[in-house]
Amino acid sequence: MAYDWVWLLTDYGRRDGFVAACHGVIARIAPAARVEDITHEVPARDVRHAAVVLAQTVPHLPPAVIVGVVDPGVGTQRRGVAITAGGSVLVGPDNGLLGWAADALGGASTAVELTEPAFRLPSPAHTFDGRDVFAPAAAHLAAGAVLEALGPVVPVEDLVRLAQPRVEVGPGRLDTEVLTIDRFGNVQLAASMAELAVAGLTAGSVRIRAGGRSHVVAVGVTFADVAPGGLVLYVDSAGQVALAVNGGDAAAELGLESGDPVTVTGESPLR
C-alpha cells in the first residue's frame, strides 16, 4: 500500500540542516509523497514529551507514514521499528516514543525491525538515523514497499513502552502528574475529564497542591472564565485536565515541570 503523506516529528529544531536532510531523502525516494512537519521543537532528548505530542496529533492526520525521532540512544543496540496502527505506519526508534501514538490509532497491529540495508542509505552514520534509517524507510513505505520487506517481525508486546503516568482517583481527590507543558505555559495533567468526574471535582472551585504550595482554583471551561491573571482548571483540547493562567504562564506561576506531582481535592484544606 502506498501513502500520499509522510509526517515528521523530531527534536532537531530549525537552526541546522537536519530537517531539510530528512525531507530531501524522502523526496528523492518517494517524490509523489507529500512531506509535512508535526513539529521539530520537541525539547532535546525528551522522549515522553514527543510521545505525548505524537499521540495527541495522530488521530487528526490522514492515513500516512508518520516518523518520530527523539533518539538519545542513537548508535546503540536499540532497535529501529515500523509499526502499523489504524491504517498508518509509525516509524522511529523503539524507545517508547511510538507506543502511545499506536494506542491512539487503535493499537499496534504489526511491527518490524528496520534491518534490511536496501531500505536505508548506503554507509549510514552512527549518529543520524533520522536521515539514514527512518527517513528512507518511511519513503519506501510511502512508495508502496511491503512492511515485512524492511526487516523481521517484532511481536508488538515486545515493543518498548513508556511508564504510564500517575493517575490515582478517590472520592474528592485526584493524585496525578504533569504530562506536558505547551508554549503558552498551560500545564496538561495526566488525568482525563472522566477521572476528574469520578473524583467529583468538575464544578465550583478546587484546591491544587503543586510545587510545594496549595492554591484555590476555579473550575472552568476556558481561560476567560477567570479574571486576567487568575488560575483555572479546565479540560483542554486533547481531553486532558489542565491548568492555565488567563493571559499568563501557569507553569511559571506554579513552578511546575513535566513529571511533577499534582494533587487536586475539594476546596477545603488538604490534611
Task: Outline where the language-model segments fall.
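N-terminal glycine-/serine-/threonine-rich phosphate-binding loop
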Residues: 1-77
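Conserved subregion of the PPM/PP2C metallophosphatase catalytic domain
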Residues: 86-98, 106-120, 181, 200-217, ...
